[in-house]
Amino acid sequence: MSNMTPREIVHELDSHIVGQSDAKRAVAIALRNRWRRMQLDKDLRNEVTPKNILMIGPTGVGKTEIARRLAKLAHAPFIKVEATKFTEVGYVGKEVETIIRDLADMAIKMVKESEMDRVKHLAEEAAEERILDVLLPPARDGFGNDEKSDDSNTRQIFRKKLREGKLDDKEIELDLAAPQVGVEIMAPPGMEDMTSQLQNMFQNMSSEKTNKRKLKIKDALKALQEEEAAKIVNQDDIKQKAIDAVEQNGIVFIDEIDKICKRADSSGGGDVSREGVQRDLLPLVEGSTVSTKHGMIKTDHILFIASGAFQMTKPSDLIPELQGRLPIRVELQALTADDFVRILTEPFASLTEQYIALLATEGVSVTFTDDGIKAIADSAWQVNETTENIGARRLHTMMERLVEDLSFNADQRSGETISIDQAYVTKILSEVVKDEDLSRFIL
């Protein structure tokens, strides 16, 4: 779990996301509070529940990007889901409890990778011995000490060659565990546990088998290391650690929550399952026990972060019980032309850097002047104002339109240096930006 301070978290988010300081502060404090809670004694720790967050803001201002970056910083089980993917119990579609099941699967994968990394050195040694056994079968009992001594010396010579990579391309035949059979079983809602048990049964049936395979030594080493590491780690410990990680540090990000709201002034009809999904979410957010194939998981201390544009609805259109479970409200601001300039230049691997690097692979040197970047930002803002405001996503459309001709003819323009300045931007984008109909359909 991450022990970064709120200031460090915000600084890290700043290198990828422009503006939205309130949202960054809120998620930074929430993430730090996860660490603070784990420092308390057990009795008090159980009483401290997470303060769930609702992020409100127009599309394309950074809500989802904050979630993506937070997932990398958290070092904890993290899942991002779309609220629109779920339906209430009894309707065809995914039930909300699958969120926790998917989170548990993710935690198992995280803990397994961590444990296998911990025993990596032992696994490498065991894999090395198995390779040497294939190259130099052990001497049989009954041979004299001299033969065994010679065998040991030869083994050391081959070990040295193996570590130096001199045997990498040599092909050997060895026994490897058969790959697990992937069995996908479709089941009616509410019977996911039964399907997971059947899947485990089929996988266990195939896990004991071994196959003879011919591989190059460098590929065989990798396969054997994974096999040996899987033997060393304790699967029951992995399962328990993963469940603890989900219960104590798990984070669920629910995007597009506004799409399951029903407007207060709307009449009946429409999607009958919208309010049902909200009611199904309530027990998870408040705290309940969910059955998964790895064991029972309590959701009392899982942090939930919800986000939505709320263009057609308002946060107050959420059912009151769910509103009460999302006590921290953060409003993200619409982006201005100045924000667009910063987005094009400041973040790590900004859009301009990406296009410069992509075209450089074909020998085309591209530079963006300050007035060129300002012209791109102004054009994007203008189209957002006159048509639909899709935030920073408009920049992707503008940039693609701008370098379309360059990208198509890059192989014929190798060695050229192209400067994208205000005149270049105006020449390509001005007609489309001015014509509202063209903007609506092209940009």
From Swiss-Prot:
The keyword Oxidoreductase does not apply. InterPro entries: AAA+_ATPase, ATP-dep_Clp_protease_ClpX, ATPase_AAA_core, Clp_ATPase_C, HslU, P-loop_NTPase. Pfam families: AAA, AAA_2. ATP binds at V18, G60, V61, G62, K63, T64, E65, D255, E321, R393. One of its GO terms (molecular function) is ATP hydrolysis activity. One of its GO terms (cellular component) is HslUV protease complex. It is found in: Cytoplasm. Its main location: cytoplasm. Keywords: ATP-binding, Chaperone, Cytoplasm, Nucleotide-binding, Stress response. GO terms for biological process: protein unfolding; proteolysis involved in protein catabolic process. It comes from the Bacteria. Belongs to the ClpX chaperone family. HslU subfamily. ATPase subunit of a proteasome-like degradation complex; this subunit has chaperone activity. The binding of ATP and its subsequent hydrolysis by HslU are essential for unfolding of protein substrates subsequently hydrolyzed by HslV. HslU recognizes the N-terminal part of its protein substrates and unfolds these before they are guided to HslV for hydrolysis. A double ring-shaped homohexamer of HslV is capped on each side by a ring-shaped HslU homohexamer. The assembly of the HslU/HslV complex is dependent on binding of ATP. NCBIfam families: hslU, PRK05201.1. PANTHER family: ATP-DEPENDENT CLP PROTEASE ATP-BINDING SUBUNIT CLPX-LIKE, MITOCHONDRIAL-RELATED (PTHR48102), ATP-DEPENDENT PROTEASE ATPASE SUBUNIT HSLU (PTHR48102:SF3). This is ATP-dependent protease ATPase subunit HslU. It comes from Colwellia psychrerythraea (strain 34H / ATCC BAA-681) (Vibrio psychroerythus). The lineage of its organism: Bacteria, Pseudomonadati, Pseudomonadota, Gammaproteobacteria, Alteromonadales.
